[in-house]
């Protein structure tokens, strides 16, 4: 690609073939133009020039290759065919220009095998010092055919392979020897996996060869271009376009000015890189290569670095080029799909670039001394690609792979960097690798890289073209392109999944891509998605039909991968889709065995069948936990590091380029302070210093992410150490052998940014880089010698340090991506567990003191970290001591940093923390040194942390240390702009605390987590306990982790995880403390997160899921994992709420057929982690399913306390109702979840809110403790439990009918579930007929039981009544249903009579008739049941007492039953109404009144409902209506039925028909009023309604009771609130009327019968306005009056008679405008209300005609009763006449109440049914429930009680206390009169 000669300038005559050109020679000046237009030409797109500037070699001479290149372009397809036909690349083809096409194709094929590309060829003849190209090909001819086969199959275009990483040209290794004429050329050797190993091709380019070389390069490029035209080249085309943007000059900066060109193909770099990954043996560079590299001018190195930083550097351009290549190489590990180019991972790009650069390292191993040769494994490409994965699975999966890859790069890197300009190939190769993330992330970056274009416009055009074309290409991807497999057997779906391109995966699946196609190594796309924790991608694959249990290599399933890598969400997704958690791989381990995190284990256990759980647990218990930990550590670091790094660089690539660079710049003070430290430190070593600077710039330019890493490495001495260790940390076990040196030597962790695919490799790469660097070795080697021992302590401290530093850098870069950073830290911690890097750290720290104070903080951090590590490695106690001191100093430093950096660099403090972690890994010696340094620094900056320091002083040293650490983190968190990072740190911190709390205190959450895992040992546990204690106070003191639930979760986890009781307690305490302290930090983090999220927006969805997974997998410590998740989730919640709350809302809130969201399902399963994840992802916590249930309902029903807390924190409404009005509190109480109920009550749940059944939570409670809890929160219990039950039963139907009335009216075939009992609900799915028949049958059974039930005492009677009322309620509902269905059928019949002769309507009609008969039978039985209870009451010696004790509802129920029977019978036989005994009916009526009084609102609703129904009903409907009203109201039905029976239906129908319209209005009013009454109407209103209703009922019996009732109810009801007033005015009348009823009842059975219905009707009417007054009058007034009434006067004077009396007698019926008063001027009309009052057109209500006339005639006018009654006419007849016609005249209304009261005792008979009801009503009135203003007037002593009732109870006493008083009054016999 590049030629060794440096291009003199960027002239347009560069030999790069960038545009399609005809065979004719083109002017050199046309090339740039072609290049610009390259993007526009589709054919051109596929072309790209691998060599940046062959012209430079020719020095201005156009290369003949250009023509050839153009020719190739002109006929790309033909050339492609030729390429396919070329089995072997021969020297002749290369030498012959006419065969250039084939030659290029062959080269491309060879490149496919070997990513290495020999940049310089002579056109006429390349002189190969060792072998001709033909030789190597001959040696491995089979490789070429294989490549051709691949190409022919469309698997991979040769250009892809060319870019891939092995150069076919070099069979085993390509060694480019420096010619004598030129400086040692840079030799790029890429192992040729396809060719036999150990075959070397050495190409020596002389100055003479430059022209030929150019032409050959051109030819090669053209061949590549032609190959790019392959269908797969769509992705690659992007790369080539990018390449076209690059100047060859950049690509090939000659190593020297000599003409000889070094052939260092990008492919060779990538190949070397891959080979290195594959072959760990290639760690050492050959001596020759090292010499050659060393010869490279250092100035160039610096310059190159500088360029990178600048952004216009070769690296940047090379990166672009490299990206292009990688795109073509999409099949390769390091390469990405064209879609991947879009992947925003600048860090990945840098990583690739670095890797590519490092790929030169392969040259060092197994190369002939004469040439730099890469010893490439003979494994197939797929093996190469997958070998990393296999290694990862075995050792650390990707860790080893990355180790090799990184090792060599690290070694080579310094020199490569030095030679970067010289060897443009290196940079191009580097760029090539980097291309994936960087370019993909930003097409714009391509343009940036193509700085070679002097014209920025041209660059922009190229970008636009490439972007547009890329989109078009994606859309145009064909199915065969998707399913075409590359050399590794990977199709496009696989590659897209590998790079977490969910959109591309979706597109491919949509196009028909095979989601289950395995690669040659046996892995599928789902495996890759699971390994990387790519939730979206995995979800898309599963949606596309991916086999969730598909087996990969070694029988590993995706679930294994997800669990081993700690990807919780992905694992849960797999489990939800049927993954088998017990499936075992070849090692005999199932996913559950691989899980080391408690959350993950719990997740898996939930999906294990119960019968298998015991076996599984037993098996797992048999495994040595230590072994498991070790295995897990190996695996986890691999995965975690990989996933974390991947995640980080993904986010970083986007943000780092966008924001990270800025952040780094902004945080230069902190990050760069470290850098300065490093710089100063490195100044001793000029190379290092230069490199550090240049590297930093370079990293900044290349990848903000890598820059951050590099920065950290370069900036902080510890960072270089740390950074190296960071890389090492990931593969610490792998790097143990020599990585300490590498780490120490490597300031270039920047390079550590591994290929986009495997960040682990990046780490390894970084580690190796130090080895490679000769610059750093001087400095780093010294510490490395120290660190070797420490590294080999079992955990490479250097590795750890590297990981940490790397994480640090990532964090700095990823300020916005704190989560990613956290993951990285966790990884690093895992890998950095062993602090074996003390030497480096010591060295750094020692020099840190020299560094500025800012640097010192970093040093302190590092020191602290090192100390901590050494503690872990060596002794916990010494560590504690050192740690305490160091920590204190560090705290002060951290505080300083945080204070100083908060403004600019939040990341700085965080970095410092990271450094600290790394430092902890240093040896104990260094710890002491650090201590000293820290002490000094401590003095300097600890003052800021005096408080924390005080805390520390209060605590023991360990405590102090941990505390200081907490402040550090705290400071870091605050200073750190990225909220996510902070939360992660905190989470890790806490996690570590849970494990070894001291770890967290050290500030290295990840390391601490791992350490904690290991320290679970007994002695370590004790240490941990101490740390935990320390942390407790620090946490209390410091608001760190921003998660409230963390403490609960942590406590939970701790309980399970902690092997130590002490540790467990400590954790718990600490968690609790943390909860309070967390919030401030979370808030700060939140604000910071908002800033960072701007950068993250594109990747937020992916990052969220990935971050969560990464967090889970990264923390070795289960506790730490969960804590991290929790903190992340909470912070994410805030984050999402702040900026992108609804990003995933669409998917997350997606519902199933039942309307349930994922959150509903997760809550029902009790999956707390998933619930948190969903909430954090923006799930709607108040989303109702189809039945109205919310997640809080589900959690309350299950009693899941933790989930309830989570939901409430997320904003769940505590008083949300379902369609039946059921609250979460009802569910918790009904299921006896005491704790859940308490939490709900604490959060504002209303204990008095009732459902549609009118049951409150207290009514649902069966447990005394639950009742007490509810009462303590103000729950009010009904005065009488039995009454309340009865009332509830009566109310429920009314409310339900009210709510679902439309269902009944509109559709007779549907039964409203709310109106049915629970038994009915269970049958809702059945047909209407079957349901109703089943209900009736069930009722019959219950009735039989009641008939056999023996009533022995009042308790039995109460139970009996309760059951009777339930039956009655059901019957009412059935009756309403019957009625609605009948009406529906009648309408249909009127529309089409013929339709009933056949078909469904006829069957429906027959069913209706059958059910009607059954209902009649049931009604008769119900009447018997009601008579039974009545007889029992009559028999009792103390009927009053029995009535009292048996709540009036019992009477009511009996009354209802009898009435219901009556109504039912009336349906069948309207005229023959079965009348219950007069006494019985009266009792029922009175009882019903009492019940209404007690129930108040309930009765009102029911009665109003009944009234409505009555209005709806017609003739027969009236009886049914009455029945339905009774059904709904319970009492109303009986009253209607009784009245109907007496009046007989015929009379009723007329009345109803006459007032149909009115009744309908009344119904509407009733509905509205019912609701109002439920909330507003008090008992007085009920009483009023009862009386008025009674009056109306009497009138109704006489004439048209239903009609009257409706009218009165309407009139009373219309005013709603005004009704109360009106009724209160007429309440005395109502009382007298009730007395009159009673008197009538005594006088005669007919009257009694009438009275009974009246009373019943009054009960039903109670809902209307008069309800309260009537009930009160009928209650208190009636009882007193009844006692006096009969004796006082049986035949009162005429003037004493009132309209209400006439209504009771049936002579007058209520109605609208039926009373008239004529004057000369006009006629005044008034309406008669049910309560006997008059209502005029203006709406004003008068008690009687006298008051009406007084108002009309004037206030001063005197109007006598005779005058008024003689002048006011009713239906044209004076009222006085109706009075004269009356034989028995009722007492005068005004005097009746008082007169009757004294007389009642004389007349009253206990056996008298009338008297009994009166007593019961009186009792109710006495208690104030039935009292009203009327009763107040009649009995002033109750006035105050009434007032109290009218006012809310809360104004006087708590509801539950008042309820107790009322209950006492009811039960107390002494209070009865």
From Swiss-Prot:
Region (Disordered): 1-27, 361-380, 707-740, 1242-1263, 1449-1482, 1512-1549, 1606-1634
Keywords annotated in UniProt: ANK repeat, Chromosome, DNA recombination, Meiosis, Nucleus, Repeat
Chief place where the protein resides: nucleus
Compositional bias annotation for Polar residues: 361-379, 1460-1482, 1515-1525, 1621-1632
ANK repeat ranges, renumbered to this chain: 488-517, 521-550, 554-583, 1154-1183, 1187-1216, 1220-1249
A Gene Ontology biological process term: meiotic DNA double-strand break formation involved in reciprocal meiotic recombination
Pfam families: Ank_2 (PF12796), RAMA (PF18755)
GO cellular component terms, A-Z: chromatin; nucleus
Entries under SMART domains matching the protein: ANK
Compositionally biased intervals (Basic and acidic residues): 1250-1263, 1535-1544
Record field: compositional bias (Basic residues): 728-737
Signal peptide bounds: none
RAMA domain sequence ranges: 1683-1778
Cellular compartment(s): Nucleus; Chromosome
Role, per record: Required for DNA double-strand breaks (DSBs) formation during meiotic recombination. Regulates the spatial and temporal patterns of pre-DSB recombinosome assembly and recombination activity by acting as a scaffold that anchors REC114 and other factors to specific genomic locations, thereby regulating DSB formation. Plays a key role in recombination in the pseudoautosomal regions of sex chromosomes.
Assembly: Interacts with REC114; the interaction is direct. Interacts with IHO1.
PANTHER family attached to this UniProt entry: ANKYRIN REPEAT DOMAIN-CONTAINING PROTEIN 31, ANKYRIN REPEAT DOMAIN-CONTAINING PROTEIN 31-RELATED
Name this polypeptide is given: Ankyrin repeat domain-containing protein 31
């Amino acid at each position: 690609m590049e030629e060794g000669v440096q291009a003199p300038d960027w002239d347009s005559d560069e030999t790069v073939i960038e545009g399609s050109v005809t065979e004719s020679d083109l002017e050199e000046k046309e090339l740039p133009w072609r290049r610009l237009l390259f993007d526009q030409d589709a054919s051109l797109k596929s072309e790209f020039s691998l060599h940046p500037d062959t012209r430079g070699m020719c020095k201005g001479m156009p290369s003949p290759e250009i023509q050839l290149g153009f020719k190739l372009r002109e006929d790309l397809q033909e050339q492609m065919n030729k390429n396919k036909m070329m089995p072997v690349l021969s020297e002749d083809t290369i030498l012959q220009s006419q065969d250039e096409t084939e030659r290029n194709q062959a080269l491309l094929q060879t490149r496919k095998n070997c990513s290495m590309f020999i940049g310089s060829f002579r056109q006429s003849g390349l002189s190969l010092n060792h072998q001709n190209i033909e030789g190597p090909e001959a040696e491995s001819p089979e490789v070429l055919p294989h490549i051709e086969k691949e190409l022919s199959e469309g698997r991979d275009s040769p250009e892809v392979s060319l870019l891939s990483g092995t150069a076919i040209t070099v069979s085993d290794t390509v060694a480019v020897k420096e010619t004598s004429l030129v400086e040692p050329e840079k030799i790029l050797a890429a192992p040729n996996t396809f060719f036999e190993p150990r075959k070397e091709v050495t190409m020596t380019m002389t100055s003479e060869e430059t022209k030929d070389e150019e032409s050959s390069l051109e030819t090669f490029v053209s061949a590549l271009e032609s190959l790019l035209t392959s269908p797969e080249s769509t992705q690659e085309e992007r790369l080539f376009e990018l390449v076209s943007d690059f100047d060859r000059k950049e690509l090939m900066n000659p190593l020297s000015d000599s003409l000889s060109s070094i052939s260092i193909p990008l492919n060779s770099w990538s190949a070397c890189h891959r080979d290195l990954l594959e072959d760990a043996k290639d760690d050492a560079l050959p001596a020759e290569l090292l010499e050659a590299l060393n010869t490279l001018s250092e100035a160039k190195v610096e310059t190159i670095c500088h360029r990178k930083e600048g952004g216009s550097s070769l690296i940047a351009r090379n990166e672009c080029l490299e990206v292009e290549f990688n795109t073509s190489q999409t099949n390769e590990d390091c390469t990405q799909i064209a879609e991947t180019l879009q992947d925003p991972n600048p860090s990945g790009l840098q990583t690739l670039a670095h890797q590519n650069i490092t790929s030169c390292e392969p040259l060092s191993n197994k190369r002939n001394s004469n040439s730099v040769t890469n010893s490439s494994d003979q494994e197939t490409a797929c093996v190469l690609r997958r070998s990393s994965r296999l290694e990862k699975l075995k050792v650390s999966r990707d860790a080893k792979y990355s180790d090799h890859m990184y090792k060599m790069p690290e070694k080579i890197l310094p020199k490569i960097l030095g030679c970067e300009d010289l060897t443009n190939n290196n940079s191009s190769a580097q760029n090539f690798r980097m291309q994936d993330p960087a370019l993909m992330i930003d097409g714009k970056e391509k343009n940036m890289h193509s700085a070679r274009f002097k014209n920025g416009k041209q660059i922009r055009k190229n970008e636009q073209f490439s972007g547009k074309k890329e989109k078009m290409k994606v859309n145009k991807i064909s199915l065969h392109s998707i399913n075409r497999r590359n050399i590794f057997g990977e199709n496009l779906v696989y590659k897209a999944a590998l790079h977490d391109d969910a959109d591309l995966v979706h597109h491919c699946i949509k196009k028909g891509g095979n989601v289950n196609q395995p690669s040659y190594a046996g892995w599928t796309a789902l495996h890759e998605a699971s390994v990387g924790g790519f939730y979206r991608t995995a979800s898309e694959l599963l949606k596309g039909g991916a086999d969730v249990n598909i087996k990969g290599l070694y029988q590993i399933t995706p679930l294994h991968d997800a669990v081993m890598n700690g990807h919780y969400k992905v694992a849960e997704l797999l489990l939800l889709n049927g993954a088998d958690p017990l499936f075992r791989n070849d090692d005999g381990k199932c996913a559950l065995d691989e899980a080391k995190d408690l959350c993950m284990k719990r997740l898996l256990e939930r999906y294990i069948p119960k019968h298998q759980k015991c076996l599984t647990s037993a098996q797992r218990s048999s495994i040595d936990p230590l072994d498991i930990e070790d295995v897990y550590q190996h695996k986890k670091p691999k995965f975690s590091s990989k996933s974390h790094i991947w995640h980080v660089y993904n986010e970083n690539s986007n943000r780092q380029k966008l924001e990270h660079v800025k952040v780094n710049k902004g945080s230069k003070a902190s990050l760069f302070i470290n850098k300065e430290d490093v710089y100063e430190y490195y100044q001793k070593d000029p190379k290092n210093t230069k490199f550090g600077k240049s590297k930093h710039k370079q990293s900044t330019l290349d990848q903000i992410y890598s820059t951050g890493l590099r920065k950290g490495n370069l900036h902080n001495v510890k960072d270089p150490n740390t950074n190296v260790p960071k890389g090492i940390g990931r593969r610490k076990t792998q790097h143990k052998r020599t990585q300490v040196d590498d780490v120490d030597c490597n300031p270039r962790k920047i390079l550590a940014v591994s290929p986009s695919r495997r960040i682990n490799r990046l780490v390894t790469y970084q580690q190796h880089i130090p080895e490679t660097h000769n610059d750093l070795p001087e400095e780093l080697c010294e510490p490395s010698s120290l660190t070797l021992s420490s590294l080999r302590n079992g955990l490479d401290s250097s590795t750890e340090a590297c990981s940490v530093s790397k994480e640090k850098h990532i964090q700095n870069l990823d300020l916005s991506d704190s989560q990613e950073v956290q993951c990285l830290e966790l990884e690093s911690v895992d890998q950095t567990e062993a602090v074996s890097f003390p030497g480096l750290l010591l060295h750094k720290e020692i020099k840190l003191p020299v560094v500025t104070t800012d640097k010192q903080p970093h040093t302190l951090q590092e020191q602290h970290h090192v100390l901590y590590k050494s503690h872990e490695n060596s002794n916990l106690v010494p560590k504690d001591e050192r740690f305490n001191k160091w920590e204190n100093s560090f705290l002060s430093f951290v505080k300083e940093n945080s204070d100083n950096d908060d403004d600019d660099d939040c990341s700085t403090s965080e970095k410092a923390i990271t450094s600290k972690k790394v430092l902890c890994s240093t040896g104990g010696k260094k710890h002491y040194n650090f201590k000293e340094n820290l002490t000094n620094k401590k003095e300097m900056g600890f003052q800021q942390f005096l408080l924390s320091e005080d805390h520390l002083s209060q605590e023991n040293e360990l405590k102090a240390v941990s505390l200081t650490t907490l402040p550090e983190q705290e400071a870091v968190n605050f200073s750190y702009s990225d909220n996510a990072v902070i939360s992660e740190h905190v989470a890790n911190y806490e996690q570590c605390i849970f494990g070894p709390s001291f770890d967290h205190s050290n500030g290295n959450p990840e390391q601490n987590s791992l350490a904690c895992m290991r320290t679970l040992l007994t002695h370590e546990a004790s240490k941990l306990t101490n740390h935990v204690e320390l942390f407790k106070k620090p946490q209390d003191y410091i608001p760190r982790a921003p998660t409230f639930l963390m403490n609960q979760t942590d406590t939970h986890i701790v309980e399970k995880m902690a092997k130590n009781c002490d540790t467990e307690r400590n954790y718990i305490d600490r968690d609790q403390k943390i909860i309070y302290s967390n919030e401030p930090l979370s808030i700060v983090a939140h604000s910071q997160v908002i800033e960072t999220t701007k950068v993250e927006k594109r990747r937020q969805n992916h990052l969220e899921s990935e971050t969560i997974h990464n967090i889970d997998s990264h923390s070795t410590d289960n506790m730490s994992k969960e804590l991290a998740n929790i903190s992340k989730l909470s912070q994410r919640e805030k984050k999402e709420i702040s900026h992108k709350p609804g990003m995933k809302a669409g998917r997350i809130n997606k519902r199933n057929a039942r309307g349930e969201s994922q959150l509903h399902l997760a809550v029902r399963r009790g999956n707390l982690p998933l619930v948190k994840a969903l909430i954090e992802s923006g799930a709607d916590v108040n989303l109702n399913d189809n039945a109205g249930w919310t997640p809080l309902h589900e959690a309350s029903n299950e009693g899941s306390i933790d989930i309830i807390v989570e939901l409430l924190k997320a904003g769940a409404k505590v008083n949300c109702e379902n369609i039946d009005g059921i609250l979460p509190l009802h569910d918790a109480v009904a299921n006896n979840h005491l704790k859940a109920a308490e939490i709900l009550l604490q959060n504002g749940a209303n204990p008095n809110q009732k459902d549609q059944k009118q049951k409150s939570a207290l009514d649902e409670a069966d447990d005394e403790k639950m009742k007490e809890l509810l009462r303590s929160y103000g729950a009010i219990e009904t005065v009488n439990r039995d009454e309340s039950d009865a009332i509830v039963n009566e109310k429920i139907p009314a409310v339900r009918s009210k709510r679902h009335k439309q269902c009944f009216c509109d559709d007779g075939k549907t039964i409203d579930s709310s109106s049915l009992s629970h038994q009915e609900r269970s049958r809702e799915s059945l047909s209407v007929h079957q349901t109703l028949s089943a209900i009736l049958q069930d009722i019959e059974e219950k009735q039989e039981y009641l008939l056999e039930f023996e009533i022995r005492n009042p308790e039995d009677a109460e139970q009996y009544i309760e059951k009777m009322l339930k039956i009655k309620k059901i019957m009412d509902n059935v009756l309403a249903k019957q009625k609605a269905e009948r009406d529906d059928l009648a309408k249909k019949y009127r529309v089409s009579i013929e339709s009933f002769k056949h078909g469904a309507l006829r069957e429906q009609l027959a069913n209706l008739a059958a059910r009607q008969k059954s209902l009649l039978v049931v009604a008769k039985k119900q009447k018997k049941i009601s008579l039974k209870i009545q007889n029992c009451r009559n028999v009792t010696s103390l009927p009053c007492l029995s009535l009292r004790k048996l709540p009036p509802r019992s009477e009511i129920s009996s009354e209802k039953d009898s009435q219901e029977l009556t109504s039912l019978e009336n349906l069948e036989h309207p005229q023959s109404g079965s009348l219950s005994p007069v006494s019985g009916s009266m009792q029922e009526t009175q009882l019903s009144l009492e019940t209404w009084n007690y129930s108040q609102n309930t009765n009102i609703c029911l009665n109003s409902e009944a009234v409505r129904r009555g209005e709806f009903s017609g003739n027969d409907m009236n009886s049914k209506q009455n029945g339905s009203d009774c059904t709904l109201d319970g009492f109303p039905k009986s009253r209607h039925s009784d009245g109907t029976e007496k009046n007989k239906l015929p009379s009723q129908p007329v009345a109803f028909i006459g007032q149909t319209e009115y009744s309908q209005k009344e119904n509407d009013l009733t509905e509205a009023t019912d609701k109002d009454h439920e909330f507003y109407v008090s008992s007085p209103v009920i009483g009023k309604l009862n009386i008025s209703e009674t009056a109306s009922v009497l009138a109704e019996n006489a004439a048209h009771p239903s009609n009257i009732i409706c009218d009165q109810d309407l009139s009373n009801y219309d005013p709603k609130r005004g009704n109360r007033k009106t009724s209160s005015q007429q309440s005395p009348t109502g009382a007298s009327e009730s007395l009159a009823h009673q008197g009538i009842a005594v006088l005669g059975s007919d009257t009694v019968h009438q009275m009974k219905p009246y009373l019943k009707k009054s009960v039903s009417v109670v809902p209307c306005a008069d309800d309260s007054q009537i009930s009160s009058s009928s209650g208190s007034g009636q009882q007193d009056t009844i006692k006096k009434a009969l004796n006082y006067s049986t035949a009162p004077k005429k003037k004493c008679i009132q309209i209400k009396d006439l209504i009771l007698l049936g002579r007058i019926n209520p109605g609208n405008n039926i009373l008239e008063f004529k004057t000369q001027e006009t006629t005044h009309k008034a309406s008669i209300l049910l309560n006997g009052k008059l209502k005029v057109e203006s709406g004003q209500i008068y008690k009687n005609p006298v008051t009406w006339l007084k108002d009309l005639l004037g206030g001063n006018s005197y109007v006598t009763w005779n005058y008024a009654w003689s002048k006011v006419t009713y239906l044209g007849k004076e009222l006085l006449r109706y009075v004269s016609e009356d034989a028995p005249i009722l007492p005068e209304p005004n005097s009746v109440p008082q007169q009757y009261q004294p007389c009642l005792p004389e007349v009253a008979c206990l056996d008298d049914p009338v008297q009994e009801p009166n007593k019961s009503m009186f009792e109710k009135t006495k208690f104030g429930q039935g009292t009203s203003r009327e009763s107040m007037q009649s009995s002033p002593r109750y006035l105050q009680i009434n007032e109290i009732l009218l006012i809310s109870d809360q104004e006087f006493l708590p509801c539950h206390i008042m309820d107790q008083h009322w209950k006492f009054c009811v039960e107390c016999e002494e209070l009865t009169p």
